[in-house]
């Protein structure tokens, strides 16, 4: 009998992964409960139906917190990022220019506009946005391409106590899959019941998990390489350490070394990016506006509930009635009957109205102060939403107030841009590793003209630096710096930029004869695109000018 090869990842290793997963799940229980609670508040469900009944059938659920999140989401979506890649060496300048045009195309193909919007909802509500950046070999009819998705935090598991997920010993991502579809894809599977199940949000619809099984993906490092294993139950579906054969082309030539040696991705990082709103020490997840504004929102709801009940009592008079009273109660309660019969003399003690004390104005003032506390705490002030106090009419003063009130949103955007920069870094590394065959892209060339380019990773691969003084200088890998620019999607920003250009033109900044004075003035200014404008004016001033004859017409 021929001896069978024992694969590095088998049933015993999967059982170890499952034990680690269950330990991680127990350690992250508090974080997961907070995320679920925040989502419930977003749905304006501050209590259960049983509490509604106990409170008398009504409880006010106002939308002040809802309005805060909607306003913050609008600010974040307005600052949609655009990447610009800058070379670190002069020889990589052209490559950086092409990548700066190609990476936005890849983001557009992944509908990153929608991914960004969904992630910003997630960041405002639960406190953390999470992205998954992987290579999908099934894209483009099997050619493969980069895939960027927003990930549900309840499906992720990492080592409790770490702030950076890259320092976690293992990283898990679980998903519920249909049992029959999984059995069809892997006919040799022997699926069993009682598998590990994810924690889920409280959906409005009834989610049936009876015919679902949990498929888990685990990422881990071994010998400095990033490895990956996909399993269900105690059975391995795929593991990079089990790929012992090199990757071949159609004619049998070796394309790449076995994945057991190279790992999953050359960059060696977990392909996930966390973007917390308000960071927490010892956790990659932060807390969101729901956690900050929960207390004042509860106070507002309680006071409004009391106000409505007091108004109901005042609008519906109630009466004390004696047991031996002479008033016909049925006719008294029937407003359609103009006559109410009584027996004998009608005394004042037969029927007496219950007095209702109207609320004092101090309670309304307290409600207004609580609402103002919520708005000030969240930064969702009237100025930030476009409402300016009476008496302020100057455009510069209004712009200054709005600029000052938006510093909280700008700080949030800066943290999101840092995460987006790391996403672009992973995209560039995936291009470097997998773009062996040329791809076609439509990019914008000079003056907005369409250009169709073919691109592969040949100029991104490490190249030899030769020898110097008898020593091998090793390999050089093109590396790029990433600058993130905000794509402001509002008419006010565009109008302001256009007005600045017109003012510079009217003041003669584009006159080559005034280039020295214009340069001194522009260097003291700060606006978007200043470096490009300085370069163009410098080139324009350096060009030789033909003398203009006297009396020559335009």
Named regions from a protein language model:
Residues 1-255, 259, 331, 362, ...:
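Extended, helix-rich architectural segments
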């Amino acid at each position: 009998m021929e001896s069978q090869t024992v694969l590095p990842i088998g049933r015993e290793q999967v059982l170890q992964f499952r034990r680690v997963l269950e330990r991680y799940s127990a350690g992250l229980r508090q974080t997961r409960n907070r995320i679920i609670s925040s989502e419930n508040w977003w749905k304006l469900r501050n209590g259960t139906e049983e509490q509604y009944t106990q409170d008398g059938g009504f409880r006010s659920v106002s939308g002040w917190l809802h309005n805060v999140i909607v306003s913050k989401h609008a600010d974040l979506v307005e600052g949609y990022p655009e990447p610009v890649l800058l070379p670190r060496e002069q020889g990589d300048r052209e490559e950086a220019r092409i990548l700066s045009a190609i990476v936005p195309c890849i983001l557009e193909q992944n509908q990153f506009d929608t991914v960004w919007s969904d992630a910003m909802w997630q960041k405002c509500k639960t406190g953390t946005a999470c992205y998954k950046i992987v290579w999908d070999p099934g894209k483009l009819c099997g050619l493969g391409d980069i895939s960027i998705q927003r990930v549900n935090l309840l499906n992720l598991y990492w080592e409790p106590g770490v702030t950076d997920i890259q320092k976690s010993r293992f990283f898990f991502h679980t998903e519920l899959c249909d049992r029959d579809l999984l059995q069809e894809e892997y006919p040799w599977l022997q699926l069993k019941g009682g598998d590990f199940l994810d924690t889920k949000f409280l959906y409005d619809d009834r989610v049936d998990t009876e015919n679902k099984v949990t498929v888990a993906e685990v990422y881990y490092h071994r010998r400095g390489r990033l490895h990956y294993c996909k399993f269900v139950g105690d059975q391995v579906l795929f593991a990079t350490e089990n790929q012992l054969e090199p990757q071949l082309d159609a004619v049998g030539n070796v394309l790449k070394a076995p994945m057991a040696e190279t790992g999953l991705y050359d960059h060696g990082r977990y392909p996930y990016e966390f973007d917390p709103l308000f960071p927490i020490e010892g956790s990659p997840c932060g807390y969101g506006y729901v956690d900050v504004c929960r207390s004042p929102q509860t106070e507002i709801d309680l006071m409004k509930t009391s106000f409505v009940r007091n108004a109901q009592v005042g609008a519906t008079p109630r009466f004390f009635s004696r047991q031996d009273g002479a008033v016909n109660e049925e006719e008294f309660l029937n407003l359609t009957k103009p006559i109410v019969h009584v027996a004998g003399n009608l005394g004042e003690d037969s029927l007496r109205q219950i007095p209702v004390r109207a609320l004092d104005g101090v309670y309304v003032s307290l409600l207004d102060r609580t609402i103002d506390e919520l708005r000030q705490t969240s930064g969702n002030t009237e100025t930030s939403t476009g409402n300016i106090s009476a008496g302020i009419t100057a455009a510069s003063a209004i712009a200054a107030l709005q600029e000052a009130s938006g510093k909280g949103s700008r700080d949030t955007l800066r943290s999101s841009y840092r995460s987006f920069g790391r996403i672009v870094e992973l995209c560039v590394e995936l291009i470097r590793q997998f773009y062996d065959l040329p791809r076609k892209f439509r990019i914008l060339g000079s003056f907005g003209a369409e250009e169709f380019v073919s691109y592969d990773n040949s100029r991104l691969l490490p190249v030899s630096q030769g020898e110097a003084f008898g020593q091998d200088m090793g390999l050089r890998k093109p590396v790029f710096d990433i600058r993130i620019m905000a794509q402001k999607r509002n008419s006010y920003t565009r109008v302001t930029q256009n007005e600045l250009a017109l003012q510079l033109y009217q003041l003669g900044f584009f006159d080559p004869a005034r280039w020295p004075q214009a340069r001194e003035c522009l260097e003291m200014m700060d606006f978007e695109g200043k470096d490009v404008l300085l370069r163009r004016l410098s080139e324009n001033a350096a060009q030789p000018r033909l003398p203009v004859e006297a009396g020559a017409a335009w």
